[in-house]
């Protein structure tokens, strides 16, 4: 496969917009054997949502399904970029990019604009590209600097025995 700005790193996460993270995690684990799931308390961040600055409050949890990270997002504020699809369930997959601005530009050149952008407290730039008109979902892009965190989620799953599914991150 030839390398492009978007395929250097494989898709490494799928994300679900959920009403109740713990219930979803338990159902996903029971069916697929995914887990354990490490959750974070709600946080509020100022984000750009379709050109408007909003305060987004949400909780997240992360689990593992083979080599794929599973992210669960429970949103506690409105408006928000998760409810646009009109239902709970699959929301986006994630790909790392070395050139964030170049990726945004490449998507714009073929008609796909960001639904949402933000910069984390640690300086990580994140965007959800709106691919719904063609693919029915969004794509999250950001730099691979998150790899150590993602590796820690995978490490929690490595020798997991199926018990203690729901854990507070950092506890």
Question: Can you annotate each of these PLM segments?
Answer:
Residues 10, 121-125:
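Short acidic/glycine-enriched loop/turn segments that link adjacent beta-strands
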Residues 114, 126-128:
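Intrinsic, low-complexity N-terminal interaction/targeting segments
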Residues 38-44, 117-121:
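A short, aromatic/hydrophobic, helix- or strand-capping loop or linear motif
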Residues 1-12, 16-38, 52-111, 130-171:
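Glyoxalase I/VOC metalloenzyme domain signal
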Residues 41-47, 109-113:
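Short Pro/Gly-enriched beta-strand edge/turn motifs at strand-loop
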Residues 45-47, 81, 124-126:
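Short secondary-structure boundary/hinge segments and terminal tails
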């Amino acid at each position: 496969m030839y390398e492009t700005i978007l395929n250097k790193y494989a898709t490494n996460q799928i994300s679900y917009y959920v009403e109740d993270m713990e219930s979803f995690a338990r159902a996903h684990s029971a069916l697929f054997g995914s887990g354990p799931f490490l959750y974070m308390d709600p946080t509020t961040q100022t984000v750009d949502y379709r050109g408007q600055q909003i305060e987004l409050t949400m909780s997240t949890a992360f689990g593992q399904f083979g080599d794929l990270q599973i992210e669960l997002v429970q949103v506690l504020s409105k408006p928000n970029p998760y409810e646009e699809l009109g239902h709970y369930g699959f929301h986006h997959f994630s790909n790392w990019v070395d050139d964030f601005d170049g990726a945004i530009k490449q998507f714009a050149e073929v008609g796909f604009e960001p639904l949402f952008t933000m910069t984390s407290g640690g300086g990580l730039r994140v965007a959800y590209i709106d691919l719904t008109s063609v693919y029915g979902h969004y794509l999250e892009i950001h730099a691979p600097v998150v790899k150590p965190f993602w590796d820690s989620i995978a490490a929690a799953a490595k020798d997991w025995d199926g018990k203690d599914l729901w854990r507070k991150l950092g506890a």
